[in-house]
Structure formats: C-alpha cells, structure tokens
Amino acid sequence: MAEKEEGVKLIGSWASPFSRRVEMALKLKGVPYDYLDEDYLVVKSPLLLQLNPVYKKVPVLVHNGKILPESQLILEYIDQTWTNNPILPQSPYDKAMARFWAKFVDEQVTMIGLRSLVKSEKRIDVAIEEVQELIMLLENQITGKKLFGGETIGFLDMVVGSMIPFCLARAWEGMGIDMIPEEKFPELNRWIKNLKEIEIVRECIPDREKHIEHMMKIVGRIKAV
C-alpha cells in the first residue's frame, strides 16, 4: 500500500459532483489523501473560507501547502503531478476537445439542468425538452465508444459522470422525471453501465436514496426563495 504523500488533502462534500470527480482522479492515480467533508450549503466553515475566499465552495485541493480550487483545474493538476494512469488525452486536439465538452457540461448542462428543477408544472415540458437537446449532443459524442476516454476512464468521463447520471439525473428522478430514457439515449445509457463497472466510480458514487433526498431538499430551498 502506498504511503500517504505529505500534504495531500481534499476539502469536499459527499453530495457534490465536483468533489466526487476529484476523488475519482485521486483514486485512479493511487494517491492517498486526507478528506474533510463540508456541509457548505448550511454553513461555510472558516477553513473553507480561508482556503477558497474567492468562490467559497468545494472542492479545494491542498498539496504540500499549495491551494487549488475548481474541480476541472484540480483534475488537470492531478494529471500533471502524478503521471501514471493519464486522465487527459495525449493529443493536443483531443485534450482541447475534452476541455470544451467538460466546460459545456459544467456551464450549459448544469445551469439549464438546475433551472429545469424549479420550473413550474406548466413549463416543465419545455424545460425537459431544452435539457434533452443538450444531452443529445453528448449522446452523439459517445456513440461507438466504450468511454469518453476510450477504453479507460478519463477526464470527460469523470466530469460528465459525476454531474449528469450521478447527480442531475437523481434530482430529476426525485421529481418523477426520467431525463435520460434508454429509448432516447441508448449510447449514454450503455456508457453509464460501463462507468458503473469501474471500481473507483462505484466507490465515489453517493448512496442513491440518500442523494436523492439531499437533492430534493436543495430543490425545496431554491423554490422557497
């Protein structure tokens, strides 16, 4: 068993897809780390505010005194610091496209997906259609591939997987909506099954029932504002 490298610490949240993807990367690389769980939606700890005063959110990686926020930046840092089991593609073009689609997921799909959760019943059909149009773009990207990273899990698998099937889809499920039906998205559903077969993914997926309950509480808070 590898010895714990000095100063590798992750400040995260069990329910956060952004934290979970970082854990996937650390586990894939075989990097032992200390983990501190933040209930940051209730109250932000002094430690979190100290480590990430700009965005005040998880995850934050601390490595030998260096502090790094933002999950996608952390994934790239991990990949360049521990070079075994590469996460990002080697070719400059493929690397750029992985970043492009990761940004699309975290900015477009996440934003519109979260917005769809609080739509009124009269507008929910329109919201579902809008989200599914975005998800269809990912369906087209994964067609014919085992994983976004090829034969092994990579950067985009971690970003898409942590956010869509293992977070947003659970929130939609809690509202009685199947946002990624197999008949409409056969390739994505095949990819999700492949993803679930990977040990580090299974280790990092939050408990389904607990996660759905948590997501419904968040939706309730947003609707109450």
Swiss-Prot record:
This protein's record includes keyword DNA damage: no
Catalytic reactions of this protein: RX + glutathione = an S-substituted glutathione + a halide anion + H(+)
Every GST N-terminal domain range: 6-86
One Pfam family matching this protein: GST_N_3
One CC-aspect GO term: cytoplasm
EC number: 2.5.1.18
First-tier enzyme category under EC: transferase
Positions in coiled-coil regions: none
Disulfide bonds: none
SUPFAM superfamilies, A to Z: GST C-terminal domain-like, Thioredoxin-like
PROSITE patterns: GST_CTER, GST_NTER
Keyword Phosphoprotein applies: yes
Occurrences of domain GST C-terminal (ranges): 91-218
Localisation: Cytoplasm, Cytosol
PTM-bearing positions, type Phosphothreonine: T152
Keywords, ordered alphabetically: Cytoplasm, Detoxification, Phosphoprotein, Transferase
GO molecular function annotations of the record: glutathione transferase activity
Annotated residues for binding of glutathione: S16, P17, V43, K44, K57, V58, E70, S71
GO terms under biological process: glutathione metabolic process; toxin catabolic process
InterPro entries from the UniProt entry: Glutathione-S-Trfase_C-like, Glutathione-S-Trfase_C_sf, Glutathione_S-Trfase_N, GST_C, GST_C_Tau, Omega/Tau-like, Thioredoxin-like_sf
Principal place of residence: cytoplasm
Function: May be involved in the conjugation of reduced glutathione to a wide number of exogenous and endogenous hydrophobic electrophiles and have a detoxification role against certain herbicides.
Similarity-based family: Belongs to the GST superfamily. Tau family.
Protein name: Glutathione S-transferase U3
Protein's organism: Arabidopsis thaliana (Mouse-ear cress)
Phylogenetic lineage: Eukaryota, Viridiplantae, Streptophyta, Embryophyta, Tracheophyta
The gene coding this protein: GSTU3
